[in-house]
Amino acid sequence: MKTYQEFIAEARVGAGKLEAAVNKKAHSFHDLPDKDRKKLVSLYIDRERILALPGANEGKQAKPLNAVEKKIDNFASKFGMSMDDLQQAAIEAAKAIKDK
């Protein structure tokens, strides 16, 4: 059984972490460092490559597709990116694919 002081101390720590997460500066696609921007574009290129395979949403390709999409979501959460910023990354990936 926790004492009142222990409970309050844990609540303050949790609130501090939540406040830090909320106040974390959100980045747009163009504000990202080059390394992170290239990483995000490469994730979208991988996603498009997997989607181009037959049966991409089922069978063997479903697991890698889900893994790449989860990496994209984690990346967006880490930098506080909006859907518009992710759309910009997808556009950059499409340009890179078209240029190849």
UniProtKB/Swiss-Prot annotation:
Positions of the record's site feature: Cleavage: 10-11
Residue ranges of the propeptide: 1-10
Cited function: Internal protein II, which has a histone-like character, binds weakly to other components of the assembly core during an early stage of bacteriophage head morphogenesis.
Name of protein: Internal protein II
Designated gene of the protein: ipi2
